[in-house]
């Protein structure tokens, strides 16, 4: 599943093809994604608009224009590619946005868990049900050790599950949670309410560093993710623990272990990450 670094990589990739350009048409070959695509609404409200900004909130891409905002979510296996106009579609190429200047932005989504939603200008974007309850952005200064510490008091769930809660902080998916906890030296199964302020400060720094490093390397390609230029992400080469059960810890040489928390695989070093 594309996580925050992959979505931010996509945003940066498609931005030059969209911002300041007029959208000349939309071609929907398969409207049945996570929710039905509002084809007639897009043809009426979006076509002819100039895209003013391509933003990101959590894992949602927001194409802002005078009449509203197009919200795009990549789902489990989606990607956006920039292709020349009239490029024949491949299997699972469900939507084309045709831009002035001879380029298209194409949505490829094999599993069809992605979403294309129109938010009219008359509806406050931040109040949309998909956006209203999201926590702070992990790279923003509002995400810090004190914030994580205060929100965790009295909570018994595993600290890994705590930082993956999108109402606590957005965009810390399974891969990046494992990697950030490793960098901070915190056991993933430790109760969130028992982690001290100093360790949460280290964890907040680790979250920012892991996500920042991944964005700089174009995200993490394990299976489905391909950037807007057709290239994979390379952060997979920098993973310390995720997917490395049975291998040596890069810090101390102890065998990396795997456990399931909240129905997700977690990877950690039992020596470096003690409760």
Curated annotation (Swiss-Prot):
GO terms for molecular function: 8-oxo-7,8-dihydroguanine DNA N-glycosylase activity; class I DNA-(apurinic or apyrimidinic site) endonuclease activity; damaged DNA binding; zinc ion binding. Disulfide bonds: none annotated. It catalyses: Hydrolysis of DNA containing ring-opened 7-methylguanine residues, releasing 2,6-diamino-4-hydroxy-5-(N-methyl)formamidopyrimidine; 2'-deoxyribonucleotide-(2'-deoxyribose 5'-phosphate)-2'-deoxyribonucleotide-DNA = a 3'-end 2'-deoxyribonucleotide-(2,3-dehydro-2,3-deoxyribose 5'-phosphate)-DNA + a 5'-end 5'-phospho-2'-deoxyribonucleoside-DNA + H(+). The active site is at 2 (schiff-base intermediate with dna), 3 (proton donor), 59 (proton donor), 264 (proton donor). It comes from the Bacteria. Binds 1 zinc ion per subunit. Keywords: DNA damage, DNA repair, DNA-binding, Glycosidase, Hydrolase, Lyase, Metal-binding, Multifunctional enzyme, Zinc, Zinc-finger. A zinc finger (FPG-type) spans 240-274. Its EC number is 3.2.2.23, 4.2.99.18. InterPro entries: DNA_glyclase/AP_lyase_DNA-bd, DNA_glyclase_Znf_dom_DNA_BS, Formamido-pyr_DNA_Glyclase, FPG_cat, MutM-like_N-ter, Ribosomal_uS13-like_H2TH, Znf_DNA_glyclase/AP_lyase, Znf_FPG/IleRS. DNA binds at residues 92, 111, 155. Its cofactor is Zn(2+). One of its GO terms (biological process) is base-excision repair. Belongs to the FPG family. Involved in base excision repair of DNA damaged by oxidation or by mutagenic agents. Acts as a DNA glycosylase that recognizes and removes damaged bases. Has a preference for oxidized purines, such as 7,8-dihydro-8-oxoguanine (8-oxoG). Has AP (apurinic/apyrimidinic) lyase activity and introduces nicks in the DNA strand. Cleaves the DNA backbone by beta-delta elimination to generate a single-strand break at the site of the removed base with both 3'- and 5'-phosphates. Monomer. This is Formamidopyrimidine-DNA glycosylase. The lineage of its organism: Bacteria, Pseudomonadati, Pseudomonadota, Alphaproteobacteria, Magnetococcales.
């Amino acid at each position: 599943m594309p996580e925050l670094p992959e979505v931010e990589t996509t945003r940066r990739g498609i931005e030059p093809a969209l911002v300041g350009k007029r959208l000349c048409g939309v071609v929907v070959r398969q409207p049945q994604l996570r929710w039905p695509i509002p084809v007639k609404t897009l043809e009426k409200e979006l076509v002819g608009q100039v895209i003013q900004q391509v933003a990101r909130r959590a894992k949602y891409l927001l194409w802002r224009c005078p009449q509203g905002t197009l919200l795009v979510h990549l789902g489990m296996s989606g990607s956006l590619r920039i292709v020349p106009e009239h490029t024949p579609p491949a299997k699972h190429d469900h939507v084309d946005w045709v831009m002035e200047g001879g380029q298209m932005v194409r949505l490829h989504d094999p599993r069809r868990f992605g979403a294309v939603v129109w938010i009219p200008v008359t509806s406050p974007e931040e109040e949309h049900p998909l956006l209203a309850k999201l926590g702070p952005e992990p790279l923003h200064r509002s995400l810090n050790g004190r914030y994580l510490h205060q929100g965790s008091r009295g909570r018994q769930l595993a600290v890994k599950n705590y930082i993956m809660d999108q109402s606590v902080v957005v965009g810390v998916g399974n891969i990046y949670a494992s990697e950030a906890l490793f960098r901070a030296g915190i056991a993933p199964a430790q109760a969130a309410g028992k982690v001290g302020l100093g360790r949460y400060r280290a964890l907040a720094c680790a979250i920012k560093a892991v996500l920042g490093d991944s964005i700089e390397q174009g995200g993490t390609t394990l299976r489905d993710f391909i950037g807007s230029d057709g290239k994979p992400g390379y952060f997979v080469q920098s993973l310390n623990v995720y997917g490395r059960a049975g291998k040596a810890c890069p810090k101390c040489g102890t065998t990396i272990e795997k456990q399931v928390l909240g129905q997700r695989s977690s990877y950690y070093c039992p020596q470096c990450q003690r409760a």
